[in-house]
């Protein structure tokens, strides 16, 4: 009966998780969103690749036997690594990939392009034995036209060699053992096959035209009453005859109502291209802001003389203007931005898989950060995955776009040329995104030549020669005089790093690119900001206080709200825990761990968001209250609470004392100070209630009020005897797609009968699975079984290429009569958004990693409990 009730509880919990959020994100492919019936199709090339780690001779040849190579799906990061994987434990060197697939005979005569979103390091791509592309750099697209090399109706082979080994000849250039992040490796982002007709809209990265290629959307005057949009599109005709037709635009609002359209006549000679420009004047405009990230849909069609669509797709645009006024800070859409912009840096590193995140994991990263009220992300230290950028566009996160680089310069001219090329391709890839706030073309913390900063700023403006384009540079770096936005600390923050008042330029504006980290020295890296979640309450409380308002002067949330308008905000270092090359310790300073499990500081950040619900946001918003005290025998007597409410009450135990806090109305500094109620919790009070059989009377209850109304509550209870494992899916309401690549985190927790999580527990959880999913990682990477840390044990689940149900079971590794009862949860994958291309036999043969489910588990708990009641009585009698 106990097991049945547990299963029903978990099933109900899972239902709530999936039902909570109706919104399902959609992701761009090669910079566009597909429209059916246009002749343009995107196919996922992610499934069924063969992979070999190391050098191998002859693997580019069609006849090479790869049957012994490991089967994998993209994104692939070469290997699965444990949560603690710093100090260069990851593989560096060559890795080879091969993919077999049948090219549909119906594709013959059309244009087909392989589009790799990124391949780490230096790479080569062969198709059917012919070298088609060499590429240097691990963060930008690799594009290969395969139209004339494919064998239609037959088997084809793509071979990729990727080498993530140390190489100073191209950026970042820094050897990994002296690098503050890791390169990871492999084909770690998506690969697409794009099919079009021979008259088509070009791709800006493929064409390599300054401020050209593809579609370029820019803006003139912007206001709610009337906004000017400039649209430029490059078309190409590779057919054997001339083309006459039209280029058609439709701008749709969020309700899919057409608010503007345009038909431009065009003629293109064979083997030629043309660029058409037009302007649109839009009335009654919904402007894009971080708190109102309104996206219009721009449909683009190419039609022939018979009015038949021969190419087309849509992109999402947000209409907004950016301005940094001399000494007066940031202005958005013609109005001064009302408060400092607070954000965080983001590496793409995730537990177990490294950089090889699925699109949904990228989206959930952005969603979790936006839930805290952050408004800007710095892409440290390279351009991020397009899926993450898609998320920033629709969730309302400004982005500082970084050039790949970190504390390294190579004086060889070729190195600088690679940097310049990266900058151009970053702008071309992301120039239409409303989320892009600043371009950071300089190399992070690097002593580059005197002319470099001026040169790269010029390149950005060559590629974006329109209004609302801004670049930023460190205030103390060479060439900073050319930049109107400079990175530094505020005078209210870290005095060591801040510009002295006599050096502050009244014509400039300032921003803190990295704040919060506080190491003793740059060798030991001991820091009160670096608190592993597994270390528990006190370190997490110290971290949160340091980020909010420490007892010493330092750049923190509070300090950034004590600046003039000239200092426009700052980004925390760092949002998530991540691996590093040059230090054996991971970076523990994230507000979440590398599985994106929150620390106390996450809720401190969340308490700074506005307390009014915002219906314009997909992300969470509105009032919140959180008790940062677990009521363990070791929990502090002082109770810390994070809340954005006007007032908060804290009730200690049923019928007990009620404590009250009211936020001062005319305060300065952070929007919501950390609340501390002194000398509240004592374990002996809980003991007394427990001995009276009044365990349910022992609790902390926080209630938040806005305008006198109760709007938020949070209750914490002491955890009793661990009796079961409970599970939940950490998916932010998104579906799991059966594309062989998508991943979702399932979290197991040791809990008591009431579902309270046993934070102080050292169990190991073994996950097993059945159905259309596989566990990512294994015992070798400490991914399964998983050690319980601060009460929880997470695991990554990956979909297969077949939609269906997935059942996950969690058990303690060593089971006995009184160990916690197994937990179960069921989820279901849905059909993929795009057709999958690959050898079907190999797609189905990808190993089902992890333990396949055995339904026999620990079912003895109920009978054991009856015996234990007698033991409990005997102990009480003899005490």
Q: Where are the regions that the model predicts?
A:
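Accessory carbohydrate-binding/adhesion or oligomerization-edge regions at the termini
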Residues: 16-82, 161, 165-170, 186-188, ...
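Accessory beta-strand-rich segments of carbohydrate-active enzymes
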Residues: 23-35, 43, 55, 92-212, ...
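Substrate-binding clefts and catalytic carboxylate motifs of secreted carbohydrate-active enzymes
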Residues: 41-60, 79, 119, 179, ...
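Active-site-adjacent substrate/metal-binding segments within catalytic domains
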Residues: 76-128, 133-136, 167, 198-207, ...
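Short, hydrophobic beta-strand segments
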Residues: 146, 278-287, 675-695, 784-801
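Extended acidic/polar, glycine-enriched regions
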Residues: 151-155, 232-325, 802, 827
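Beta-strand-rich structural segments
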Residues: 231-235, 301, 641-643, 728, ...
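Substrate-binding/catalytic cleft of secreted carbohydrate-active enzymes
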Residues: 363-368, 376-601, 605, 622-628, ...
């Amino acid at each position: 009966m106990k097991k049945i009730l547990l299963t029903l509880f978990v099933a109900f919990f899972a239902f709530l998780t999936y039902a909570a959020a109706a919104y399902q994100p959609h992701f761009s492919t090669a910079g566009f969103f597909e429209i059916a019936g246009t002749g343009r199709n995107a196919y996922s090339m992610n499934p069924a690749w063969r992979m070999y780690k190391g050098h191998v001779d002859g693997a580019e040849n069609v006849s090479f036997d790869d049957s012994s190579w490991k089967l994998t799906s993209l994104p692939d990061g070469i290997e699965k690594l444990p949560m603690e994987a710093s100090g260069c434990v990851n593989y560096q060197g060559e890795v080879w990939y091969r993919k077999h697939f049948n090219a549909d005979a119906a594709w013959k005569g059309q244009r087909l392009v392989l589009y790799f979103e990124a391949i780490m390091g230096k790479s080569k791509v062969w198709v059917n034995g012919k070298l088609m592309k060499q590429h240097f750099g691990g963060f930008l697209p690799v594009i290969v036209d395969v139209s004339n090399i494919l064998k239609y109706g037959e088997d084809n082979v793509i071979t990729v060699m990727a080498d993530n080994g140390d190489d100073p000849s191209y950026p970042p250039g820094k050897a990994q053992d002296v690098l503050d992040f890791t390169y990871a490796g492999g084909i770690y982002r998506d690969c697409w096959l794009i099919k079009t007709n021979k008259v088509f809209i070009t791709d800006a990265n493929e064409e390599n035209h300054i401020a050209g290629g593809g579609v370029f959307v820019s803006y003139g005057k912007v206001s709610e009453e009337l906004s000017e949009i400039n649209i430029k599109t490059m078309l190409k005709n590779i057919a054997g005859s001339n083309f006459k037709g039209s280029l058609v635009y439709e701008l749709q609002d969020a309700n899919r109502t057409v608010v503007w359209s345009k038909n431009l006549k065009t003629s293109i000679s064979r083997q030629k291209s043309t660029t058409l420009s037009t302007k649109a004047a839009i009335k009654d405009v919904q402007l894009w802001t971080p708190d109102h990230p309104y996206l219009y849909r721009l449909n683009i069609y190419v039609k022939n003389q018979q009015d038949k669509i021969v190419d087309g797709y849509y992109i999402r645009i947000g209409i907004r203007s950016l301005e940094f006024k001399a000494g007066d800070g940031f202005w958005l859409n013609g109005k001064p931005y009302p408060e400092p912009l607070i954000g965080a840096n983001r590496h793409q590193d995730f537990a177990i898989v490294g950089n090889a995140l699925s699109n949904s994991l990228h989206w959930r990263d952005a969603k979790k950060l936006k839930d805290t009220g952050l408004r800007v992300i710095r892409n440290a230290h390279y351009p991020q995955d397009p899926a993450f950028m898609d998320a920033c566009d629709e969730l309302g996160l400004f982005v500082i776009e970084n050039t790949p680089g970190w504390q390294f310069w190579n004086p060889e001219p070729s190195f600088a040329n690679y940097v310049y090329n990266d900058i151009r391709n970053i702008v071309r890839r992301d120039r239409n995104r409303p989320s892009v706030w600043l371009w950071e073309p300089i190399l992070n913390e690097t002593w580059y030549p005197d002319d470099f900063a001026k040169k790269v700023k010029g390149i950005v403006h060559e590629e974006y020669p329109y209004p609302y384009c801004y670049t930023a540079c460190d205030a103390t770096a060479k060439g900073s005089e050319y930049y109107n936005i400079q990175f530094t600390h505020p005078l209210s923050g870290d005095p060591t790093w801040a510009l002295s008042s006599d050096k502050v330029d009244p014509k400039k504006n300032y921003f803190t690119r990295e704040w919060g980290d506080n190491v003793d020295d740059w060798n030991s890296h001991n820091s009160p900001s670096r608190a592993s979640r597994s270390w528990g309450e006190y370190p997490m409380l110290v971290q949160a206080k340091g980020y909010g308002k420490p007892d010493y002067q330092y750049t923190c949330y509070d300090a950034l709200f004590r600046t003039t308008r000239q200092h426009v905000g700052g980004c925390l270092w760092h949002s998530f825990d991540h691996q590093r090359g040059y230090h054996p310790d991971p970076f523990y300073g994230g507000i979440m761990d590398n599985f994106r499990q929150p620390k106390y500081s996450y809720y401190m950040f969340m308490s700074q968001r506005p307390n009014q619900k915002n219906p314009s946001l997909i992300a969470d918003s509105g009032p919140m209250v959180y008790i940062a005290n677990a009521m363990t025998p070791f929990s502090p007597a002082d109770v810390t609470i994070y809340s954005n409410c006007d007032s908060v009450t804290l009730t200690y135990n049923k019928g007990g004392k009620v404590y009250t806090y009211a936020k001062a109305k005319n305060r300065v500094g952070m929007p919501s100070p950390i609340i501390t109620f002194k000398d509240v919790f004592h374990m002996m009070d809980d003991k007394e209630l427990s001995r009276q059989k009044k365990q349910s009377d022992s609790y902390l209850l926080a209630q938040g009020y806005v305008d006198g109304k109760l709007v938020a509550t949070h209750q914490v209870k002491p955890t009793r005897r661990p009796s079961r494992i409970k599970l939940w899916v950490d998916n932010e309401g998104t579906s799991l797609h059966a594309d062989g690549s998508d991943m979702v985190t399932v979290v197991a927790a040791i809990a008591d009968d009431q579902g309270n999580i046993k934070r102080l527990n050292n169990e190991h959880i073994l996950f097993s699975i059945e159905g259309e999913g596989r566990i990512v990682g294994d015992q070798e990477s400490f991914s399964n079984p998983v050690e319980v840390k601060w009460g929880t044990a997470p695991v990554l689940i990956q979909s297969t290429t077949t939609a269906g149900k997935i059942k996950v079971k969690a058990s303690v590794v060593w089971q006995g009569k009184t160990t916690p009862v197994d937990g179960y949860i069921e989820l279901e994958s849905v059909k993929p958004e795009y057709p999958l291309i690959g050898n079907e036999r190999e797609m189905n043969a990808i190993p089902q990693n992890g333990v396949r489910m055995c339904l026999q588990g620990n079912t003895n708990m109920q009978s054991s409990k009856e015996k234990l009641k007698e033991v409990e009585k005997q102990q009480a009698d003899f005490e």
